[in-house]
């Protein structure tokens, strides 16, 4: 299948990183909902095709640009959510908790600008600001984006309450802060299908300064933090639970 021409600049990011020619990419997929994303990942896993997750390409490190031939998954199509009990719909991409108006569910394919525009009439805002308002929320979570406000308000990690993660074989995980916690350096996660994933966290000490190298790993950690900043190597996000602040 020829590569998509939907987003012709999508083989280069904001840092002008360019690796393969468009012709070397087997296929570009732009899923529009979770079911399509699950099927795309499941097929790629079955056929052992390399996958690159692509957002708005506002990054400067080339992480959204395919390094080798394979499948590009364009996440800009995941810009809406289904209804959820206990949440009221504000926008196709935003649901606000009825019990706690400072909590909400957000689609990964929505931009930072669109999210804060939707929150403004509610007298709410989302503090993380990586310096590019076109950046997608999913990309912010995948990179644990920070920026000029991080000294006062912290990085993206501080505002993530839940994640719905699609693993590379199509398995779905629902992660909630405070519920899914490691036992020392060991973890166990139950997938939506009932499969249990168990193992050991990386055995290294993270520096107590700003650091973007490797997966976040600490004893007794919230396992949601393993996926925040993982840059797509563990899975894709189909739904993101955020904490907001009052204006």
Give the positions of each predicted feature.
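N-terminal flexible segment immediately upstream of the FAD-binding catalytic core
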Residues: 1-49, 56-103, 153, 239-246
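Residue-level marker of motif borders
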Residues: 28, 52, 104, 134, ...
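FAD-binding subdomain of flavoenzyme oxidoreductases
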Residues: 80-87, 94, 108, 112-113, ...
């Amino acid at each position: 299948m020829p590569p998509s021409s939907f987003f012709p600049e999508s083989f280069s990011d904001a840092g002008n990183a360019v690796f393969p020619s468009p012709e070397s990419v087997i296929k570009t997929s732009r899923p529009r909902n979770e079911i399509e994303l699950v099927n795309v990942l499941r097929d790629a896993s079955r056929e052992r095709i390399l996958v690159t997750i692509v957002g708005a390409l506002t990054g400067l490190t080339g992480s959204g640009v395919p390094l080798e031939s394979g499948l590009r998954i364009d996440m800009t199509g995941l810009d809406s959510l289904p209804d959820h009990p206990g949440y009221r719909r504000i926008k196709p991409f935003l649901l606000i908790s009825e019990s706690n108006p400072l909590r909400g569910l957000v689609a990964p394919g929505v931009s930072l600008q669109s999210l804060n525009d939707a929150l403004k009439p509610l007298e709410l805002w989302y503090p993380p600001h990586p310096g590019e308002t076109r950046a997608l929320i999913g990309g912010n979570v995948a990179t644990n984006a920070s920026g000029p406000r991080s000294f006062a308000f912290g990085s993206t990690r501080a505002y993530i309450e839940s994640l719905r993660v699609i693993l590379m074989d199509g398995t779905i995980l629902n992660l909630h802060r405070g519920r899914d916690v490691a036992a020392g350096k060991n973890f166990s996660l139950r997938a939506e299908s009932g499969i249990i994933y168990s193992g050991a966290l990386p055995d290294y000490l993270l520096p107590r300064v700003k650091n973007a190298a490797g997966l976040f790993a600490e004893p007794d950690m919230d396992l949601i933090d393993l996926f925040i900043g993982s840059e797509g190597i563990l899975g894709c996000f189909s739904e993101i639970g955020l904490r907001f602040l009052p204006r």
